[in-house]
């Protein structure tokens, strides 16, 4: 993928550069072909990834079960597939 996201029909594939243990859970800037997402959860045994899924579900107005981790359970480099997002953050709209 050239960009940090790619549409596959109604679904959205998203490349993430994760930052666990951050002061604040938030969407950051684009870095290359990844979107920086910081979560306040610690990086241990997939907890930060679970936190990120919950946060992304809120941002895209979908259920957590509508988000599939394609790769990166214990890595800062992750890819998610979001089924039929109901809302898009501004960084994707632009």
Model features per residue range: what roles?
Residues 1-53, 62-64, 68-74, 78-94:
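Contiguous, often N-terminal, cationic amphipathic patches that form binding interfaces
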Residues 59:
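C-terminal catalytic core of tyrosine-transesterase DNA break-rejoin enzymes
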């Amino acid at each position: 993928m050239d960009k940090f996201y790619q549409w596959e029909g109604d679904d959205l594939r998203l490349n993430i550069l994760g930052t666990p243990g951050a002061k604040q859970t938030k969407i950051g800037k684009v870095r290359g072909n990844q979107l920086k997402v910081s979560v306040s959860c610690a990086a241990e045994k997939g907890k930060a990834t679970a936190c990120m899924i919950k946060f992304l579900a809120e941002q895209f107005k979908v259920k957590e079960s509508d988000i599939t981790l394609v790769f990166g359970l214990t890595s800062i480099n992750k890819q998610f597939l979001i089924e039929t997002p109901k809302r898009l953050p501004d960084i994707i709209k632009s």
